[in-house]
């Protein structure tokens, strides 16, 4: 009995709060305010910065996978780094379940010790 009473009182209170001075109930809809904001309108801070960069075709925080090249000596896979060396993992074959890790140093392109794919270290500046 008490739960029915409280539920009814809550509904009446909600209706009273929605009424304006003229007595008409105020309704709020997504269409009246312009609809649901898009991701671009709602994003702030770092998320907004990343979205703007993505629209320009940039990847300031290296979130996307690197673009694979042919891996030959003339066209090596470019590996961005802020230092003079970086550790690189090569899967070698598409269905391989192990990763071959090796150090890549600044300068000439270097080969994966297992499959022979070439990688080259390129300087990268941080976005800050």
UniProtKB/Swiss-Prot annotation:
GO terms (BP aspect): mitochondrial electron transport, cytochrome c to oxygen
Membrane-related topology note: Peripheral membrane protein
Binding sites annotated in the UniProt record for Zn(2+): 90, 92, 112, 115
Signal peptide bounds: none
Coiled coil in keyword set: no
Swiss-Prot/TrEMBL keywords: Acetylation, Membrane, Metal-binding, Mitochondrion, Mitochondrion inner membrane, Transit peptide, Zinc
Any one cellular-component term (Gene Ontology): mitochondrion
Biological function: Component of the cytochrome c oxidase, the last enzyme in the mitochondrial electron transport chain which drives oxidative phosphorylation. The respiratory chain contains 3 multisubunit complexes succinate dehydrogenase (complex II, CII), ubiquinol-cytochrome c oxidoreductase (cytochrome b-c1 complex, complex III, CIII) and cytochrome c oxidase (complex IV, CIV), that cooperate to transfer electrons derived from NADH and succinate to molecular oxygen, creating an electrochemical gradient over the inner membrane that drives transmembrane transport and the ATP synthase.
Name recorded for this polypeptide: Cytochrome c oxidase subunit 5B, mitochondrial
């Amino acid at each position: 009995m008490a739960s029915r009473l409280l539920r009814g009182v809550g509904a009446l209170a909600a209706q009273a709060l929605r009424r304006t001075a003229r007595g008409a109930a105020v309704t709020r809809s997504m269409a009246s305010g312009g609809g649901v904001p898009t991701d671009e309108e709602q994003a702030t801070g770092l998320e907004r910065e990343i979205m703007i960069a993505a629209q320009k075709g940039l990847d300031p925080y290296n979130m996307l996978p690197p673009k694979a090249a042919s891996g030959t000596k003339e066209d090596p896979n470019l590996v961005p780094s802020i230092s003079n060396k970086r550790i690189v993992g090569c899967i070698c074959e598409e269905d391989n379940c192990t990763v071959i890790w090796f150090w890549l140093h600044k300068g000439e392109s270097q080969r994966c010790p297992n499959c022979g794919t070439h990688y080259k270290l390129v300087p990268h500046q941080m976005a800050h």
